[in-house]
């Protein structure tokens, strides 16, 4: 194996990290940097930058391990991948969201599903009832842990509003200030909205993409604080397994992060080549973003980063692992940003029609509402913070869903406020309003 290198340039200072390599991976660094130092690479070629200048750096990075084509990892003939707990929580969350569309559901039932206790008959699936897992204690408890209580209150408030306001008006036609049903033009889908035009089930569904899925993955399981906890680094170096298991702690943590996204995939080993799932959370919208020509390749890129990071964990290549985690954070966060802007733009375009289809507008804006809420759980790997803080997100929501001063949410939102919010989101995530 040859001695090869990574080149990283931060704030104009170049540093070299040498790795043993057996596989070549091309990485394009597109950011512009100001170079003020002389950088010399001496192996077979020499690159010298001697002037202060703005340059775009493109380099070939060689890594010291193979990246498998699928998410299949074994040890002594046994799989080392396990994320059944994540699949369980996704199933619980999905059934809870479904219950929000059944007007016979009580608030006690919804809250019990959210805060499931082992053995309670909260779900239609006996295995879920027998489980000690629950959704509530994994909601908003990582990157936004200081806001965890407020986040759970938000979710429970939407559930309560659905039961108290929407269910009693299930057969009433909605109007400004009054909950009820509203049908899309041409005999399309019937939507059930609250007094301000919001579909509470969509708010809960899309908010959980951030508060449960993204938060657990990006701000929890794939962070150095989690992966390196205890003696994990030393244990991974010698591949010390968890008692009675085929995997190490670090491998399992990485897989648990993977499970929150791919836990309901039809083929969890190869969900890109063999797409399909009954997921209603992150994985579903990865597929939707990937189908947009402006973001084609997103699904493959994200899954490859998961495979690369997992392979790096096996080899105890922790810098490569963290680089893959950063790639995952950027790509998964982008999915949330793209869909938030997309739905706000769709609502704005709908309102601009000569005869707006308000049911369609409300549906788009309800989905957008939940995705905007989820932005507080994203992670910008360059800053180590979300792309928008909770305070910034709540301020944005107050503009796209105004409910003060007698205003009635989506009934009164303006096209300009929707376009401004969509543009602000697009700019932060590095795309344009037109791309959305």
Predicted features along the sequence, with ranges:
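Generic signature of intrinsically disordered, low-complexity, basic-rich segments
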Residues: 10, 34-36, 40-42, 50, ...
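Mature extracytoplasmic or organellar-lumen-exposed domains after removal of signal/transit peptides
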Residues: 62-436
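Bacterial Sec-dependent N-terminal signal peptides
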Residues: 17-73, 435-436
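Intrinsically disordered, low-complexity peptide-like regions
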Residues: 3-4, 8, 35, 43, ...
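Sec-dependent bacterial lipoprotein signal peptides
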Residues: 1-20
């Amino acid at each position: 194996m040859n001695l090869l290198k990574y080149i990283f340039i931060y704030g104009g200072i170049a540093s070299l990290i040498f790795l043993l390599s057996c596989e070549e991976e091309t990485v394009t660094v597109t950011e512009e940097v100001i170079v003020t130092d002389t950088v010399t690479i001496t192996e077979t070629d020499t690159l010298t930058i001697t002037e202060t200048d703005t340059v775009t750096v493109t380099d070939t990075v060689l890594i010291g391990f193979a990246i498998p084509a699928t998410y299949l990892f074994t040890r002594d003939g046994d799989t080392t991948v396990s994320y059944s707990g994540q699949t369980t929580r996704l199933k619980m969350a999905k059934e809870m969201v479904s219950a929000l569309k059944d007007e016979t559901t009580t608030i006690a039932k919804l809250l019990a599903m959210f805060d499931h206790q082992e053995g309670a008959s909260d779900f239609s699936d006996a295995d879920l009832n027998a489980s000690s897992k629950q959704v509530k204690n994994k909601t908003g408890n990582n990157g936004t842990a200081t806001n965890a209580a407020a986040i759970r209150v938000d979710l429970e408030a939407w559930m309560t509003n659905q039961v108290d306001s929407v269910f009693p008006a299930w057969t009433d036609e909605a109007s400004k200030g009054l909950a009820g049903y509203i049908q899309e033009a041409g005999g399309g889908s019937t939507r059930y909205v609250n007094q301000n035009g919001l579909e509470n089930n969509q708010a809960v569904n899309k908010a959980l993409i951030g508060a449960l899925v993204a938060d657990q993955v990006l701000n929890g399981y794939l962070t150095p604080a989690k992966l390196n906890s205890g003696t994990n680094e030393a244990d991974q170096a010698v591949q010390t397994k968890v008692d009675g298991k085929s995997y190490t702690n670090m491998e399992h943590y990485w897989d648990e992060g993977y499970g929150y996204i791919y836990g309901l995939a039809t083929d969890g080993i190869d969900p890109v080549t063999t797409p399909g799932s009954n997921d209603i959370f992150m994985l579903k919208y990865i597929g939707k973003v990937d189908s947009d020509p402006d973001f084609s390749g997103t699904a493959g890129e994200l899954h490859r980063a998961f495979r690369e990071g997992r392979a790096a964990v096996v080899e105890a290549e922790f810098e490569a692992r963290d680089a893959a985690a950063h790639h995952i954070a950027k790509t998964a966060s982008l999915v949330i940003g793209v869909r938030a802007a997309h739905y706000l733009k769709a609502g704005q375009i709908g309102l601009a029609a000569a005869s707006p289809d308000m049911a369609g507008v409300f549906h788009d804006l309800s989905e957008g509402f939940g995705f905007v809420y989820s932005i507080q759980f994203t992670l910008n790997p360059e800053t180590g913070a979300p792309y928008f803080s909770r305070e910034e997100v709540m301020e944005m929501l107050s503009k796209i869903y105004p409910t003060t001063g007698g205003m009635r949410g989506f009934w009164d939102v303006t096209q300009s406020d929707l376009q401004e919010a969509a543009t602000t989101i697009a700019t932060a995530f590095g795309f344009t309003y037109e791309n959305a």
